[in-house]
Amino acid sequence: MANKYAGTQTEKNLEAAFAGESQARNKYTYFASKAKKEGFEQIAALFLKTADNEKEHAKLWFKELNGIGDTAENLAAAADGENYEWTDMYEGFAVTAEKEGFPALAAKFRMVAAIEKHHEERYRALLKNVEMQEVFKKSEVKIWECRNCGHIVVGTAAPEICPVCAHPQSYFEVNAENY
């Protein structure tokens, strides 16, 4: 996923624009939640509307940086990002927090790092499924569920088309009930 701006100030500007728009989007969704809790529905809705605008602005800059590949590339990039977060970023933050007298925050950084590790593992497992063409076909019998209508199929593969709602195979997932 090379980009034509590599090594330029424009690349740095695009990265900063992407980061700024991404952060604004998240802040505005948090602000919307607070406004809603305080009884300001219109203000909450406007924060969410603006957050959606910021998401689209961020997408413009991310696309310019060729940040969106195919699903396999995106899974690999996501796994790499999560790996950095749990192996380097959060551990470094934890060490600094401890040195500066914030042991509770250091512990929280490490707990989040453990979550990021799980995210990496999940993305790598999904990437393996994509690469092995095992997203919709397994070697063992599985229970498949249509994410649109809930239709259940038992077998080694999800159907090409849901016989109930006619949605494509892409709507099926292995059923995983944990309750």
List where the protein language model places each region.
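Non-heme di-metal
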Residues: 1-179
